[in-house]
Amino acid sequence: PPPPPQTYTETKSSAASDVYKRQDMLRLDHFRGFEKYWEIPATAETAVDGCWITGPGAALFERLQQDFGELPLVAEDLGIITPEVDALRLQFGFPGMKILQFAFGGGDDNPYLPVNHEALSVVYTGTHDNNTTLGWYKSLADADREKVDEYMPADLPGMPWALIKTALESKSGLAIIPMQDLLELGSEARMNTPGTSGGNWSWRFSWDQVPAKLDRRIRTLTEHAGRG
């Protein structure tokens, strides 16, 4: 079973305090595991044979609030999320994540479509686990690319700026744009490909890649979107 909240904070609060001092906001990966997580035997060859175990839940975050006050956390709530996980996130006012690259499959109720965003969320064009926006767009099948194009207003620029502008104009309270998208880079600049072990987390940019007027373009878009 998970350790009691007291045990956790007594051993980790000092380290957590140091992290909080150096960061504006932290993302909690696999947030659903704080409500329930999938436990498998250590000797299991696959993850098939396991069971759901109740996580530390609200007690942990209540204790962290006692120690640190307001928690500047973003809940990574991607994948299959239960009502109980949503309730835990909302109880503490943690924004969830909206990934625009996930927005164009399914119907009008797709939670990643901009029309379905809410203020208590963070919108991304894509994350470290996604392709770059340009790489993603070029890799789409023709029918899927047409679906994306149909959603975008005709006056939007081409990719990746169309998706960047869409993210900035979302109702989400915060928008995060990967550097690769701002530099208009393709799949060669992808940060991470889940399930693989080679070439990940190695991409770096150099200042000579940054166009002279990029700062002005970003400023104009953010101001027009009411984020300046």
Locate the predicted segments by residue:
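Single conserved hydrophobic/aromatic residue that forms the stacking wall/gate
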Residues: 1-16, 20
